[in-house]
Amino acid sequence: AIGAQRMDKVYAWKSMLDMGIHTSGGSDAPVVSFDAMENIYFAVTRKNISGQPQEGWIPSEKISVDEAVKLFTKNAAYASYTEDENGTIEVGKNADFVVLEKNIYEIDPDEIKATKVDMTVLGGEIVYEREVEE
C-alpha cells in the first residue's frame, strides 16, 4: 500500500508532463486494463470505468486526448528505445497503427472507453478488421 498521504501523487500524468518528464502509458494488467481505449479514457477523464467520480479523481491531473494518445504511442516507443522504428506514422518506420470507429479527438471524452477498433495494421499488413453490423 502506498498510504493515504501519497494517493494524490498516483498517476500524476499532468504534473509529470508539465515538468518535462518523459512518461508513457501501458497496460499493467491486472492492475489496470489491458484495453488502450480504456486507459486513454482514464488519463483524460480521471474517472473509473463506471464514470466515477463525476468530476474525475484529482481533476488537476487530467490530460488532453492528444497527450494521452502520445503516452501510448510516441512516448511508449521512446520508453522502450524503439522510437526510430515505432511510435509515430512516418516514412521508414513500422506501419503499426489502428483505425478507430470514432475520432476520439472530437467525441465526448466519456465515449472514448467504448470506442471500438475497426482495423489493426502491423508492419503495413492488415491483421484485424472488425465486422461492422449493418
Q: What residue spans do the PLM features occupy?
A:
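Residue-level structural signal for beta-strand termini and adjacent loop
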Residues: V132-E133
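His/Asp/Glu-enriched, well-ordered alpha-helical/loop segment
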Residues: A1-D110, T115-G123
